[in-house]
Amino acid sequence: MKKIFGHRGLPLTYMENSITSLNAALEYCDYVETDVRITADNNLILFHDPDLNERFIKELTTEEILSQLDNVEKDELILSSRDQIKGKVNFEIKTDSLLQPQIDILFQKMLPILHPEDIVTSFNWKSIQDFKELFSCRYGIILDHEDALFEAKSLSIHDEDMFFMVERTLLDSRHFDLPLNRTVIWTVNEKNDFVHFLDMGAFGVITDIPDTMHIYRK
């Protein structure tokens, strides 16, 4: 059966990337997708944007971040144990704005979190390549522009375990030639597109509304 990924959980119902949002989504999907960053005090935080109120997440301590969010408990955003999430996870590792030492710390802190059925991905292809031998789970790269298809194709040939998280419009490119059984398409919120991508044989589809889209899976 093709897989449904809940994009940041159920973001239209709950705070995106919150533990509550992720666990609620798992009622409807096979995986939840969530973003992971690192704080100034080296905690893993489930947070999409690189900044908060014009300061980088990497420059803020956990307490400073929580003080700027309304009524958010620490355990909703700080990932300290894999047991917080009750199903399979696609962890997207966010490294934009980080220097290499921080990137290494972020990936190293993720290693004991990962479960064998998880997928760890990033726009930082180099770090995925550098750490892939240490991952206890599947891994992949994210691409959102056509020029990236050429290098991704080469990687797909040389690494038969690599997954590809592909922005949906790239499937219309004449240069798209990635293995569909290792391709996950984002972000799909229209019924016809959802059904089409699953029918064409993609491994999975990422959606903001898994509570709706699961109805259309055959």
Range-by-range predicted roles:
Residues 1-218:
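Phosphate-group recognition and catalysis centered on beta-loop-alpha active-site segments
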